[in-house]
């Protein structure tokens, strides 16, 4: 290592920048004690659209819940009641 390389700042990779930003977002969410992420309604709608491609389903048949279990554990639970196949 030359003396110039020692004083020249290291160029950050995009992965390290993305990781750093993600850590900031996660820390901010934890500090806000947000009970559920803001994207849950859109997530439920997207899941409902995908299921509707294959099965006729009512929106009330899909339940999505989010729970905090401790400081570093979050649980996303998805319950889908599928209709009975009529033959």
From Swiss-Prot:
Keywords assigned: Cell cycle, Cell division
GO cellular component: plasma membrane
Presence of keyword Metal-binding: no
Any matching Pfam family: MinE
Lineage top rank: taxon: Bacteria
InterPro entries reported in the protein's UniProt record: MinE, MinE_sf
Described purpose of this protein according to its UniProt entry: Prevents the cell division inhibition by proteins MinC and MinD at internal division sites while permitting inhibition at polar sites. This ensures cell division at the proper site by restricting the formation of a division septum at the midpoint of the long axis of the cell.
Membership in a protein family: Belongs to the MinE family.
Alphabetical list of NCBIfam families matching this protein: minE, PRK00296.1
Name of protein: Cell division topological specificity factor
Organism in which the protein naturally occurs: Vibrio cholerae serotype O1 (strain ATCC 39315 / El Tor Inaba N16961)
Gene (UniProt): minE
